[in-house]
Amino acid sequence: MTGNQQMERQHQVAIVGGGPVGLALAVELGQRDIDCVLVERHRAPVRIPKGQNLTGRTLEHFYFWRCVDEIRASRVLPPGYPIGGVTAYGNLMSPYFYWAHTGGRGPRDQDYFFQRNERLPQYATESVLRARLRDLPSVTTHFGWTAERVEQDDDGTRISIVPSDESAFYSWSADAQQVSPQASDARADRRVLRAEFLVGCDGGRSLVRESMGIERSGRDFDQRMVLAVLRSRELHEALKRYPESTTYRVLKPELQGYWQFFGRIDVGEGFFFHAPVPKDTRPDNFDFLGLLHEAAGFAFAAELDHVGFWDLRVMTASRYRQGRVFIAGDACHQHPPYGGFGLNTGLEDAANLGWKLAATIQGWGGQDLLDSYAQERQPIFRETGEVMIAGGIGRDRAFLERYNPEKDGQEFEQAWAEFGRRARSARQAYEPHYEGSPVVAGPPNGVCSIHGEPSLAAQAGHHLAPRLLSNDRNVFQMLGQGFTLLAFGAEEAAVRRIDEAARSLRVPLVVVRDSFDAERAAYAARLVLVRPDQYVVWAGDGAPADPMTLLRTVTGQELRYGAGRGLPNG
């Protein structure tokens, strides 16, 4: 169709934005046979190497999305290459530095997560997810289309889409020293898509969020940042002074707590670089090579492949839902790429919202289940942004104002060692949980928070730790697409009561039986109820006093116990 002709088709879920979060949500829904449509303005993934660090928890999602092997095969770094970072004072040639490993060591990774972490460019992650979508017949994709307008009414949601005009996207040519517009397409065709629900995964400048009148709050640091993509063999060789690392950040007083940092794209010559720059900086009026040399501490030959800019903000949406419309990923939370939280947080949004949308559409999720998405996810990012990111900038700034190696070298060395130790331990204390969720039978006065301690014990509101069964398979290999009841040495009558309650409510439930010994004893409960995103919603040694109320609570059909109120055992 051409001109002003329009085509309407009804879907169950429409997704605006097909970056990694939107793609992941489409996979999550498609695997549950939900009819969804995805609209993405780019025809192909944009080859800018951001969002590279994928945690062990995120790799669990890819396992359940049935493409974890493809993710690992898409890595650019050699298998087993250490995922960790160097922090240096002044520049990368400084004698003052510390190193922090962020992959595959200790209970957080080997014991607490079923998968080890991975590192690859975001465009490679997107390519894997796009390929996975091709195997899911219930998902329709519109790549190269842009959402122009979003509306909702009592009957559903409505999106007007047009072919993308990619002349709005620019590339930086280091040779020509200018920006060049890409080829554009005429907006000759308009279409209208309808859906029961709509999810905006369309980034920090979200059309969906703005159309719904959802405001954001947080902190705007009023700081322009540059993202440069470069190739330099000389830089690679110079960085051999450090243990093998994936990131190299520089702290110094004049940066006021902001970072200059390099990240590896590959092992050999590919890097990206972030740093604060003056507000009026453009690709054609700034010495970017000079900035790279300043951060590195020496001059080196380099080829610039891309230069872009972003504004340093830590922002959270006031709400994640407006009627039938939801937002996820950067559309509801935005922050600088400090700490590797961004993409992982967005993918957790997708996993959380996806099963709840499917449950609601399929009829076994109650009217309150969808509200629990924001009730769980919003406080997690608010604390992440305020404590880990904005708070981290403040802590770095305070340290740099207080200590200086030129004034008191011994005092600085002692403080720097302690500074590094605290930086390493802070991330180890990051354990997002939903103890205060209204759809979790959590402890009295529980709250949803990032502050916790990874534990092998099964705790309501916390991520399930993977354990081996007596047949040498992992518990995670037995988890169902719906709820799963782990019954380890439990009385059969108790198992039967919970199973019968689930059947009567049409809640999909898989029962995994085994003995209560060996690794399974670490759960400290003979009965563990696990929801579709691998979080524990209830644990005990005997059946709850009212299994029907338990199942209604954790599926949003009844909030009798409310947030943070436990269900006693019978």
Residue locations for each model-derived region?
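Beta1/beta-strand and adjacent pyrophosphate-binding region of the FAD-binding site
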Residues: 7-21
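Core beta-strand elements of the Rossmann-like FAD/NAD(P) dinucleotide-binding domain
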Residues: 9-11, 186-197
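Conserved mid-domain beta->alpha element of the FAD-binding
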Residues: 17-27, 31-33, 62, 129, ...
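Glycine-rich FAD pyrophosphate-binding loop
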Residues: 30-51
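Active-site-adjacent segment of FAD-dependent monooxygenases/related oxidoreductases
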Residues: 47-50, 55-132, 254
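Conserved FAD-binding catalytic core of PHBH/FMO-like flavoproteins
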Residues: 131, 139, 181, 197-314
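A conserved short coil-to-beta-strand element within the FAD-binding core of flavoproteins
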Residues: 143-158, 163-167
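C-terminal helical "tail/cap" subdomain of flavin- and related membrane-associated enzymes
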Residues: 318, 358-463, 470-479, 483, ...
